[in-house]
Amino acid sequence: MSHGASSRPATARKSSGLSGTVRIPGDKSISHRSFMFGGLASGETRITGLLEGEDVINTGKAMQAMGARIRKEGDTWIIDGVGNGGLLAPEAPLDFGNAATGCRLTMGLVGVYDFDSTFIGDASLTKRPMGRVLNPLREMGVQVKSEDGDRLPVTLRGPKTPTPITYRVPMASAQVKSAVLLAGLNTPGITTVIEPIMTRDHTEKMLQGFGANLTVETDADGVRTIRLEGRGKLTGQVIDVPGDPSSTAFPLVAALLVPGSDVTILNVLMNPTRTGLILTLQEMGADIEVINPRLAGGEDVADLRVRSSTLKGVTVPEDRAPSMIDEYPILAVAAAFAEGATVMNGLEELRVKESDRLSAVANGLKLNGVDCDEGETSLVVRGRPDGKGLGNASGAAVATHLDHRIAMSFLVMGLVSENPVTVDDATMIATSFPEFMDLMAGLGAKIELSDTKAA
């Protein structure tokens, strides 16, 4: 499938032992929020380790369009924020490119302001559902103009005075939770979010760090109630962004699968809401050693030493899905080389990611000789530990559907399979992991971009 003039295929080939020590780019979730909260806070915020992928930069541009001053000195991003309640009406539509996180969180942040703000994005983002964020904003008094099915472009206009709400999040979505809390920042009174299934909690931790009056209670059933007092003061902070666990997954799984590998990955975010993949791989028999666990900016961080391992199939508990929703594509690749079947359930959220990620993974696996079954919300992969016959000798390419995680996952597969694996486009890897190709090559991975851009 062509993605227009700028797509560029890539091919990965069987590689021998990967080795080295690498530092992963900063966490995407924390990077988005660093720009947003720094832009909103009073005074100066300084950020090191920021993920400089296109998605995060688009969030920074949106904050600049609403009055924040952002500059870079050396490795440090310096933000002069507008003060809570001080965002200015953007003069042009806010373009978030491929970034659902930046788009949905900013809708919450600015939607309750008494002016018009318009949100646009690329072809992939324009297909994704925004109603999950727009519905609670409507309850707070926000007027919404959107395309059919609550898709982009979307224009929001807040009321003179927003209404605080108590909102029970209907699906496991940190973006919905965060959007409501961010809307609550500029709403008088207490905004309450009830979360039946815990999702990544960076918004809560970081807002507390910036000085918001925010409390979290968890009941006996694990239901979390988050209360935020609106219109309080946020104060600029110093943030060192830890390495993204979702990006860590690619060199980590490659090191587990390529025989003779020994790779150390530094400064990885180990927040318990994000470590579902590591836990699952350990259950499969992965040799992952957690070194030097420490706290940095209120978050758990550690270094990981990963050695090639013999994996066995497992059934992944459904309730683990929120803590590893972005990691199922690379888990499916690991499962393709495990002994026996790996069963993954509760995958409905994968159908509304950058692509229908579930069918994209299943189709890519089948194209490369893997025995798998795709259900409505499940995937079963039966592995072949020696990789015999896997890959695609004819060079047929996996359709990535503009999805960076599909591209990286299948390039990892090609490092282990008997035949090469080709993806139809690797350009969008830059949205989350611009250094991927160089970092993997430095460890000894054989991945080549095609010389010709696809038409």
Swiss-Prot record:
Q: Where does phosphoenolpyruvate bind?
A: 28, 128, 175, 357, 405
Q: Which InterPro entries match?
A: Enolpyruvate_Tfrase_dom (IPR001986), Enolpyruvate_Tfrase_sf (IPR036968), EPSP_synthase (IPR006264), EPSP_synthase_CS (IPR023193), RNA3'P_cycl/enolpyr_Trfase_a/b (IPR013792)
Q: List compositional bias (Polar residues) regions by residue number.
A: 1-19
In biotech or industrial settings, the protein's use is given as:
Roundup Ready crop lines contain a gene derived from Agrobacteriums sp. strain CP4, encoding a glyphosate-tolerant enzyme, the so-called CP4 EPSP synthase. Expression of this enzyme confers crop resistance to glyphosate, enabling more effective weed control by allowing postemergent herbicide application.
Assigned EC number:
2.5.1.19
Q: Is Cytoplasm one of the keywords UniProt gives this record?
A: yes
UniProtKB keywords: Amino-acid biosynthesis, Aromatic amino acid biosynthesis, Cytoplasm, Genetically modified food, Herbicide resistance, Transferase
What reaction(s) does this enzyme catalyze? 3-phosphoshikimate + phosphoenolpyruvate = 5-O-(1-carboxyvinyl)-3-phosphoshikimate + phosphate
- Superkingdom assignment: Bacteria
Q: Per the record, what is the consequence of mutating residue 100 to G?
A: Confers sensitivity to glyphosate allowing glyphosate to bind in its extended, inhibitory conformation
> Which residues participate in 3-phosphoshikimate binding?
29, 33, 173-175, 326, 353
Listed under GO biological process in this entry are: amino acid biosynthetic process; aromatic amino acid family biosynthetic process; chorismate biosynthetic process; response to herbicide
GO terms for molecular function, please?
3-phosphoshikimate 1-carboxyvinyltransferase activity
Where does it localize?
Cytoplasm
Give the family from UniProt. Belongs to the EPSP synthase family.
Q: NCBIfam families, per this entry?
A: aroA
- Quaternary assembly: Monomer.
Task: Specify the protein name.
Answer: 3-phosphoshikimate 1-carboxyvinyltransferase
Q: What's the source species for this entry?
A: Agrobacterium sp. (strain CP4)
Q: What is the lineage of its organism?
A: Bacteria, Pseudomonadati, Pseudomonadota, Alphaproteobacteria, Hyphomicrobiales
